[in-house]
C-alpha cells in the first residue's frame, strides 16, 4: 500500500484490513483509487405469498454453497410467521440432501471448511446455538479425516444475539419470523454490511418495496436456479453498500475493468496548412 509505484489497490477480505488500507491511502502523498469488497451478512426475506419450495432451494444454495465460505452467503432469513414452520421444514430438508465429501469429486456438492480455525469456530458456534436457539438440522462435525461439518439450520435464536450481525463464513443459517413486511425490511437492513440480499414474494407491491428499500449492492427476487444471495460478476456489477464496499463494482466483468481505466479529456485546436494536408492523406479524422 505504501509503495510509490502502486497506482491503485484492489482488496477482498475483512472489514478491519480494508479500513486499514483506506487509512493508509488517505494518509499518503497522493490520492489513489481503492476498490474493496469487505464481506457481508446477507439476508433473505420470505413473504407469506412466496413459493416455499423455490425459496428453500434458493436459500440452501446461498447458505451452503462453498461450505458457506463466501462473502455472498445467505446467513439469515426472515420468514412471515404464517409460513415460518413450513419453510423451515423445507429448508432443513434441503440441507439434509447435501452430499458432503471431497469437492474435487463430482458427486459431492459441499466440501470441508478451509482450516482448523474455521472448524473450531463452527464447533464453538454450534455449542452456543444449542443453548440459545433451536438447531433444526446439522450442528455436527463429520469425517475426522478432514474439516467436514454439516450444513446447519437454526431457528428461534434471540434477535439481539451477536450472530445475527456477525459474518460467520460457515454453513450456518439463522431463521426467524416477522408479521409485517416493513418490519422484515428494517431487520434486514439493521447490520453494518450491505453486499447482497434476496426476497421471495408473489406480491408486486412487496417486491417493489424490497427493491426500493433494501440496502445492498446486489439483490435478487425469486431466484432459485442459483443462490438467492450471490454473485454474477461476469454479467453484472458486484459490490456492496455500507461496510461491504465503497463501490457497486467491487469485482468481476467489464464493470470491474472500468475502474482500472483513467479518464482524460483531449482537445486539438487545428491551425495552419499542415492539418489540411493530413486530412487529405487520411491521417487525421473526426
Label each residue range with its predicted role:
Residues 3-6, 45, 99-103, 110-111, ...:
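Conserved C-terminal structural/oligomerization subdomain of aldehyde/semialdehyde dehydrogenase
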Residues 4, 8, 16-158, 181-182, ...:
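ALDH superfamily catalytic-core signature
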